[in-house]
Amino acid sequence: MFSNHLLSLAIWLPIAAGLLVLATGCDRRAPLARILAFVGALAGFLVTLPLFTQFDRLSGGFQFAEFYAWIPALNINYALGVDGISVLFVILNAFITLMVVLAGWEVIQKKVAQYMAAFLIMSGLINGAFAARDAMLFYIFFEGMLIPLYLIIGVWGGPRRVYASVKLFLYTLMGSLLMLVALVYLSFQTGGSFAIEDFQNIKQIPLFTQQILFAAFFLSFAVKVPMFPVHTWLPDAHVEAPTGGSMVLAAITLKLGAYGFLRFILPILPDASRYFAPAIIVLSLIAVIYIGMVALAQTDMKKLVAYSSISHMGFVTLGMFLFTNQVQLQPWALKGAIMQMISHGFVSAAMFFCIGVMYDRLHSRNIADYGGVVTVMPKFAAFMMLFAMANAGLPATSGFVGEFMVIMGAVNYNLCVGALAALTLILGAAYTLWMYKRVIFGAVTNPHVAEMKDINRREFAILAILAATVLGMGLWPEPFIAVVHQAANDLIAHVAQSKI
């Protein structure tokens, strides 16, 4: 019965759970709100698991499809489906939401119900964006998830939370308005349809028109990634966001922008993608190298990891726009970009949670305030070492898989581009291990550090689960690659066809 509606359950179950949690009201019922939020997040994650176990890895196209006429007068439909690209993001989102609920279990003491509800509702909206097969449905979910994210940062964030949340909202909203115009134009070209498949199957779009549409989509998605130079909102948002907000922001919401490239720009506008590919490659390399060096200069742990996220996402966009002979996408690079997004979801969430664990004890993100943490928190130090190594792209961790595949594609594309891309391994090791060394090792010079207690059972469980995912994907990436393989090959074949 439920197997035909798994995607609807993945969307509406977290939203319904969020509304139920919200109904618990005041903080006197905070224990009940936490339990309901955990049950809702766990149920939301469990309903996504059949999407992975029952997914046909040899079949292309959308699976678990659902279709209902929604607004017939405008030809807008409730159409859902996942392919090998989007299915992993739906599962990742549900998993990270469960981790976020556990992460805020004891830390959040005020407006607990509202906090938990915001994350659950946002999780459902994000799943809707990843599963939508109707462009207007995608747009509604894509924009709708900004509201709970805005509230999470604006209500539970740091001293400059209002500035950070408004900046995030304005950056993302301005780009999205242009995307709406592009969607309406494409609908006219299909005779009124908003189906994403119909957009992708438009036979002829002049190059100049493709370039205009590319600019409209690109601004919207590039801000979300975020790409250089429209990245400045992200460090502010991360610094001010609560730990759970940073976990979701880095692990999930950034992926929506990159997903937009895969779902809209590349298949709908292949000629414009080839035309602008050299510029995208340059911007991506700037993000990888320059932003990596900016991360080296940071003294705030959250800012350092925020800049490292921009650098890693630069690696993702690089892998998406490597065309062989200006015709065909590099298969290894494209699949590596998707693997990098999944890995970054695990690793970035873990890194921000580690910073949150230390902040809860010392109430400081300044690297200079720490030192010698391993002497008082040995279990925590061991976990953080694993995540630091994964962030640096160490083999046998998930961080290595996608980076290695993208570098393979980059070297095949151009040796110089491959060499520049490989610098991310050096820079990643430099800024991550520099932070780890100064925070974890050395003598205890701050008396407050000496009073810090090692991780409790809740924190240990979260870190152990995240560690298992990082090591599992690093040691056995084949199940992830197998899911992506056919959808990526279909996208490559589609993009190779000119629409001029």
Where are the regions a protein language model picked out?
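Central hydrophobic cores of alpha-helical transmembrane segments in multi-pass inner-membrane proteins
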Residues: 8-24, 38-51, 92-104, 122-124, ...
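Transmembrane helix-loop-helix hairpins at membrane boundaries of multipass inner-membrane proteins
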Residues: 1-6, 20-117, 193, 197-200, ...
